[in-house]
Regions:
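Extended low-complexity, serine/threonine- and proline-enriched intrinsically disordered segments
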Residues: 37-43, 53-54, 81, 125-128, ...
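Short, surface-exposed coil-to-beta transition loops
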Residues: 48-53, 74-77, 136-140, 164-167, ...
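Surface-exposed loop/edge segments in extracytoplasmic proteins
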Residues: 5, 48-52, 89-93, 136-139, ...
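Long luminal/extracellular ectodomains of secretory-pathway precursor proteins
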Residues: 20, 26-31, 50, 96, ...
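Extracellular receptor-binding modules and their adjoining Ser/Thr/Gly/Asp/Asn-rich linkers
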Residues: 1-34, 41-44, 68-121, 127-131, ...
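Extended hydrophobic/Leu-rich segments
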Residues: 282, 290, 294, 301-306, ...
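Ser/Thr- and Asn-enriched, surface-exposed coil loops between beta-strands
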Residues: 14-24, 53-67, 99-107, 141-157, ...
Length: 433
């Protein structure tokens, strides 16, 4: 099966201490309606205030915007913009808000989707900022996401009485089964630092974990009970780790398995005390136009191996390809304390650049026939399909433009084309690209 990703672009958004947002122009002609952003970040200062380090990410028609609420902490974000093929993947881009509401009950907000989703083929990622209040407890800022049925996205946090959160979320859904998804839900009871969730078997070399979301009852800014990572323990088990155990936490995310030529490499950065920069050689060079360097934890959070307090400059690392396309790199600001980070390099199978279709008729009536496309110069078979008995319609995908191929029926072969058979296809329409 052909790929579903049209492009990937990694943007560096440097939000210096005096800025609340950075706007960056995209360079690959993306249709931003079909784009989904992911992020890892490097916190240059030690602040733990969420209104300074938490960022929302959204698009204009040609740009990506990374925005926080207040100035102060410098943040360097690696934003990975994945553009999907709209013929194969439906992207829904919407906003949500968690208003400040008095009381101590758990807050749940449901947002209606524009289209019903097949939850076996859909996943979601969200980005948001703390729009009011300075409360630094994860009970307020940690917002868990999931689908509520097939028509709503659901967002949940423990407390809503001191802060408000708002941002954007992105649903991406395969329309033809090019990828399938499974929900991951892992609970950590108080006193527990490790747990797992079981999934149907996947091919790990074609599967990745959407950066996680979580719900927390930890009423403190210390990161050791909240910051964690998740990873594949096997093809049927996903496991989660945290160091501190002084709270109850729910982790909610998705596994995405591709059924095309997508290749996923998984690994881990071990930041020893005194280490800032980690680089790992990949099995080979990746095509940066179609490759995404991601973490499994939201925002590039690190898993602390020792108690490290509230200095958040050591708890985040951004990830990108550097110094070349054969190397994945993680970089944190502070070198204090030992940390771990799970990474994943996803080299997506490219979506075909061109689509074409037409109708096959004989004596004015639609017929079922094999339709083949060949490269005009080399004779390479670009694809074949069968026309439909309902109208004789056929549809093919190729990476070549219309000027580079010849279409013919099953009684014609390259290099001798049956022009009579070709003429029976009326009309041949070219689209896409």
């Amino acid at each position: 099966m052909l790929g579903v990703v049209k492009s990937v672009e990694v943007i560096t958004a440097d939000i210096t201490s005096g800025l609340t947002s950075v706007t960056t122009s995209l360079t690959k002609g993306q249709n931003t309606d079909n784009c989904v952003p992911f992020v890892t970040q490097q916190n240059v200062n030690a602040t733990y205030q969420p209104n300074e380090w938490m960022v929302d990410i959204y698009f204009t028609s040609t740009q990506v915007v990374v925005e926080r609420t207040t100035t102060g902490n410098r943040i360097i974000c690696a934003v990975v913009v994945v553009e999907f093929d709209p013929n194969r993947v439906r992207v829904q881009q919407k906003s949500f808000s968690m208003p400040l509401v008095g009381g101590t009950s758990t807050q749940t907000v449901n947002v209606g989707l524009d289209y019903t989703v097949d939850t076996s083929r859909a996943a979601m990622v969200h980005h948001y900022r703390q729009t009011s209040g300075t409360q630094s407890q994860a009970t307020d800022w940690a917002v868990r996401r999931n689908f509520s049925g097939t028509t709503q996205a659901q967002f949940t946090r423990r407390y809503s009485d001191e802060t408000a959160q708002a941002g954007h979320f992105y649903v991406f859904e395969s329309l033809d089964g090019a990828f399938t998804t499974q929900r991951i839900f892992i609970e950590f009871n108080s006193g527990v630092g490790y747990n797992t969730d079981t999934i149907s078997e996947v091919d790990i070399s074609k599967s990745w974990i959407v950066p996680h979301s979580f719900y927390s009852t930890r009423t403190h800014a210390e990161a050791d009970s909240n910051f964690m990572f998740v990873k594949f323990a096997s093809s049927t088990v996903v496991e989660g780790f945290r160091r501190g155990t002084t709270s109850y936490i729910q982790v909610d995310t998705f596994v995405v398995e591709h059924h095309d030529n997508t290749v996923v490499t998984h690994g881990q950065f071990d930041y020893a005390s005194g280490q800032q920069d980690k680089q790992t050689a990949l099995p080979g060079a990746v095509d940066e136009d179609y490759s995404a360097p991601l973490a499994t934890a939201r925002d590039g959070m690190l898993y602390p191996q020792v108690y490290a307090g509230t200095a958040y400059d050591r708890y985040f690392a951004r990830i990108w390809y550097s110094p070349n396309t054969s190397t994945i790199r993680g970089y944190r600001q502070s070198t204090s304390d030992s940390m771990q980070q799970r990474w994943q390099s996803i080299e997506f199978a490219p979506a075909p650049g061109y689509y074409f279709g037409g109708y096959v008729t004989e004596n004015g009536s639609p017929v079922v026939r094999t339709v083949r496309a060949y490269h005009r110069e080399t004779g390479e078979l670009l694809g074949e399909t069968t026309s439909s008995g309902i109208g004789g319609y056929y549809y093919l995908e190729t990476t070549y433009s219309g000027e580079q191929y010849i279409v013919c029926l099953d009684d014609a072969s390259y290099p001798v084309f049956n022009l009579l058979a070709y003429d029976l296809m009326v009309p041949t329409t070219i689209s896409g690209g």
